[in-house]
């Protein structure tokens, strides 16, 4: 697994192999459906912040964890599952604890 220098501006797509970005577009678009403010004209491969709309009746955290687990299961990551969890803890409002996100993703693997 690769070690990346992740900053606040690092897009989620940077954690994945370049060759799989065409698959990743659909995955990130799916996640964008649950965000508070995601413009339809945004390049989803550049999204670096995931503020989920917990007040939306269509939002369920388990859907996000299932999608992230699916990404891990397809071996698209260039970083570890734990690093993805740390990224989501820092770049989303899903949960402040990377360990909690890690366990939640693992549950759906």
Where are these regions (language model features)?
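Flexible coil/loop and intrinsically disordered linker positions at secondary-structure junctions
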Residues: 2-109
């Amino acid at each position: 697994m690769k070690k990346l220098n992740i900053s606040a501006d690092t897009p989620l797509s940077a954690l994945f192999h370049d060759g799989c970005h065409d698959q990743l577009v659909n995955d990130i678009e799916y996640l964008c459906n649950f965000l508070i403010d995601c413009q339809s004209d945004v390049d989803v491969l550049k999204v670096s912040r995931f503020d989920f709309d917990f007040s939306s009746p269509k939002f369920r955290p388990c859907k996000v964890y299932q999608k992230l687990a699916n990404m891990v299961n397809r071996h698209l990551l260039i970083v570890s599952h734990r690093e993805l969890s740390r990224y989501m803890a820092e770049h989303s409002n899903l949960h402040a604890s990377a360990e909690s996100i890690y366990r939640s993703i693992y549950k759906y693997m």
